[in-house]
Each structure stands twice: as C-alpha cells, then as structure tokens.
Amino acid sequence: MISLSLKKIALITNGTLYGADLLINEIVIDTKKIIPGCLFIALIGRKFDAHIFIHDALKKKCAAFVTQKNIKPHVPYIIVENTSIALGQIAGWVRKKTKAKILAITGSCGKTSVKEMTASILRKNGNTISTIDNLNNNIGVPMTLLQLKQEHKYGVIELGASKPGEIAYTSNISQPDIILINNIHCAHLQGFKSLLGVSKAKSEIFSGLKPNSTVIINLDSHHFSQWKKDIKNSNILFFSIKKKKYSNFFCSNIKIHIHGTSFTMHTPCGKINISLPFLGYQNISNALAASAFSFALKIPLKKIKIGLLDTPIVSKRLESIILEPNKILIDDTYNSNVSSMISAIKVLERMPGYKILVTGDMAELGENSMMYHQMIGNTANSSAINKIFSIGDMSSEITKIFNNGKHFLNKKKLSEYLKNVFLKKKKITILVKGSRSTKMEKVVEDLIKESKKKC
C-alpha cells in the first residue's frame, strides 16, 4: 500500500490520535495476518467485535490501532466513530493517490470469472491488482484498494451486494474509470425483493463513476433502458452472445467440449479465434465482457486472446474433473441461482455419456422460491439430461417435476446411491450444483474419493 502517517489517517477518518506519530506501510483487520509494524483496525460486526483481539495484536508487535473504544494500549491509537467506515475512508484516499485505471464489476452471476479473465489479460500489459477470491463487500473492496501502489497500472475490483446501498458505498470508494454490469438475474431476492430491485441495486455502481468514463453493458440482460439516465455522459460498449446487430463484441462458431470452449470473437478491431479453459455459454459471455474491458484500455487483440487462454480455472465453478476415462465430474458447487442453474443444464446436456444433475437448494430466492425450483424441473425436462438427484427442502420441487428424478434426505445416502450409478455406467457425466449454504462440495469430495479407490 501507499505509506501514510497516523496523523494523516486521523485526518482522513476524522479521528483523534493518541500517542506518537508513525509511518504505516501495512493495514490489517485480521490478527492472523499481523506483521510487526502494521496498523490494526478493530472492526465491529453483527456477530463479532475485533477489539477483543487487541491484546493478541500487541503480542505480535502491532504498531498502532484504529478503534471505536478508548482501550489505552501501550502503543499509538486512533479513536474513530466507526471503524468500518474508517477503513473505507483510508482506502478511498489511497485510491485517489494512484494513477491506476480502476475497473469495477457487478452483476448477479459471473463477477469473479470476469474479474479473473480481465486481470489475466491486463497483467500482460502492466502491474495489476484484483479482488482476492470474491471478497467484494464493504470490507473486501477497501482491503483490495489498500493494495494499490504507485507502480500499479490497473485495478480490477468486484462489487457485490446482498441488499440496497452496498454497491453505492463501494463504488464511491473505488471511483472506477470503467464499469460493467455483467447481468441481472434472480439472485439474493430476499434482500432485493424483486428482479427490479436487483437491477436498481446493481445500478448503484454508476454513483462512483467518473465523468466521460466507459460503461460496458450486456445486451443479453434486458435492463439497459432503466440505466440510460445514469450513463448519458459515458462511452458505452455493448456485448452479446445473441444480439449481433447492436453489439461491439459478439461471437460465432461456438464449440463446447469436455476441456473448455472455443469461438470466434467479433470486435470493433476485427475478429479473432478464442479458446477458453472453461465450460459453458456464460463463460463465453464473461470472456466478451473481459475483452470489452480490455479493449476500452486499448489492449491489443493478441494480448486479449493470450490472457483469456491463461486465465486460471476458478475452483467450483463448472470445474471439469476427469475421474476416469469416459467418466467426468463437473464441480459447480460454489453457488447457485436460477440463471446459473439453467446454464449448468445447458453445459451438462452437451457432455458425453449418461448425464446426471445432482442439486441442492437454490437459496435466497424469497417467497417465489418454490416456483423457481419448479421452473428448473421444467427446463430440465426439455433438456437431454437423463437423471436428477436432489437434496434439500426446495430442490425436491425440481425432482417432482422432472420425469426421472430422485430426492434424498441426507448427503450420505445420496453419495452412496450416486457412487453405485457411477460404478455401473461405462460413460457418464455428473454435474453437482447448489447454493453455498448447501455445501454440495461434500458430494464432489465423496465421488473423488471413490474414484481414487479404484486407482
């Protein structure tokens, strides 16, 4: 991070400094990550208060603290009204002191994948930081921005939310030069109430956008008309898998196979053949988004192609695992909502052999959760999937609708049954999916263990 003094931090946060002034080169919020000489910010959440860890931080030679309480440690400290807000204020100051181009991403699905693709491309052209994992909330975004140094050329920041107001806050801290709303789908409906609520929350990203900046819009998500007033002074780039006529970036010659996807990408600078180490149409869309981001920064198409190919596979997101010859496991257990479930079905039906979807509940869908699960059952009936196994309160609605489904009450019985099917079939593809809370990765782990027994 950019070094700053405790006096400066007190000024930025409207806090009061007690003790000597020091130069700070590292800020931490987790005592497990403390290094000698760092500043520890004691955050307070709904279920925790980091002030109780200050004694531990002192033992590890923390140099100073930002607190909400007059704890009087034997080192300098700053008292502020709200430590979480103070963290954001410091991060916002650091962001303003760098010349890095900041790219901000939000949307219902694919944020992390687009972030990884974009960062992979930009690293071919200069020093780049990006959101670690999916730490995209009011704490994760400031912690990412604090990594910025003068030598950084780009920052790729993921902005997530589970309720209104959160993205407006992180966007204003980030002050992005280029933004993307990747898509709008039925996700986190408990917090946003409706699809319109999701759209309004994601559009909060415009609040921090600089004048005459660039906005990237997915024309396959039908909410552009609601955002026109927010982006009238911005440059706009459009991408789409379906709407070639109006798009700056679109694709043709799509081929999906067990190891990834290939297609021809059409851009304002011509067309180029692209290969991705990822499965699924949604990752084609994500690649178009990442390419539009990079194009806005004048990155050549050849570097975009190489960056996309070199993107690391994101764990538990349509991750293809060859267990045995002709036996494929697709781990898509990171999360689940209506759109990503439909995408998973489309991927599975293109895979070889006997096709089984194993699903847990899609969480946070609000009062219409049953209807959405039934909709997935109907979608699966129109696909080439052979079998669905479900577990969870709501996922039983999927197997009730699907013509060849079986519901389980616990993961142990599900895993045992699935292992038997796996052993009997000579050619099979199994896709496992569920919301984070369902912990469907346990089913994946059991299948991998079973496969290793045979080796």
Curated annotation (Swiss-Prot):
GO CC field: cytoplasm
Molecular function as annotated in GO: ATP binding; UDP-N-acetylmuramoyl-tripeptide-D-alanyl-D-alanine ligase activity; UDP-N-acetylmuramoylalanyl-D-glutamyl-2,6-diaminopimelate-D-alanyl-D-alanine ligase activity
Enzyme class: ligase
Source organism superkingdom: Bacteria
Pathway: Cell wall biogenesis; peptidoglycan biosynthesis
E.C. numbers: 6.3.2.10
Family the UniProt entry places it in: Belongs to the MurCDEF family. MurF subfamily.
NCBIfam families: murF, PRK10773.1
Protein name as catalogued: UDP-N-acetylmuramoyl-tripeptide--D-alanyl-D-alanine ligase
